[in-house]
Amino acid sequence: MKIKETNLSVFNKQSWEKANRQLLAKMLQEFMYENIIEPKQLQKQGALATYRWEDHRGVTYTYQAKQRLFDSFSVLPESIKLTSKASTPTFSEALQLLISLSEDKGMSSSTAGHLAKEYFHTLIADVHLQNRKSADELAGMDYAELEGEMTGHPWITYNKGRIGFGYDDYLRFAPEQKQKIKLSWIAVAKQIASFHSLDTLGFDDVMEQELSGKTLAEFEKELTSQDLLAADYYYIPVHEWQWMNVIVPLFAEYIANDLIVPLGEGEDQYFPQQSIRTFVNTTNRDKYHVKLPMSILNTLVYRGLPSERTVIAPQVTQHIKGIRDR
């Protein structure tokens, strides 16, 4: 993609300032709750109080907030005022607070730099989310589409960091973009893979439900063309981003030795959900949701699938079903 072709239509001074102010309000209220900052209460009228907090460089934050349950707060974005004894702050408002705290709390430059990246990614997503639908419109949406209207984790301030995505990946794969995708499939040799399921569900059962006879025949034909036997492999869906950024770079030896074989795309289309790695089938809602490992960092964790939890999942499912059926 040439830089002149980059979709930048959502970015303008007004939308950026609005997203910044909303994120700054969230940062202030969450940092108050966590006692990261301890602002002085100037006055209170009913449920609304005015607060002031000053960092070590003389940047002062004055704002209004409502006390909520469990010692939490709700800061009014439009009430926030920043003043500086030295000069007008030169950074965007959310980044200004991060810099203030990084210096006040002795945060390392590498940590501060990483957080700045997460906050900027979050701001970009927040700008894209500004033209959300009305409550009436949301009420008529099914949950697969509704997740594309959500703003992320309600308490974590850098809740859409998605470290690993470039802007092109964001436009293609972020849930708020509501871009349907098709899943790619690979064949993985049974000597390096294992299949785990409920006792009543076999691998062939899953494949026959999730893939059409036409697709299964095409996959077998692809393996046969390379003098490989379909019976020696498991078919596994993969995300395109994971394939390009993780599987090929880290498992090239397996690919070279036919232990991993790319097969192509499935026919069905999917919507990504808030977790990034979970997908809902929009072609056939009777089919399973699909959760795929994606090695991006979002809301404090990498979105992989830890093997020990994945392997034990069928047993947990069986146990919960047993409780339900009592």
Annotated model-derived regions:
Residues 2-326:
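Nucleotide/phosphate-binding site architecture used for ATP/NTP-dependent chemistry
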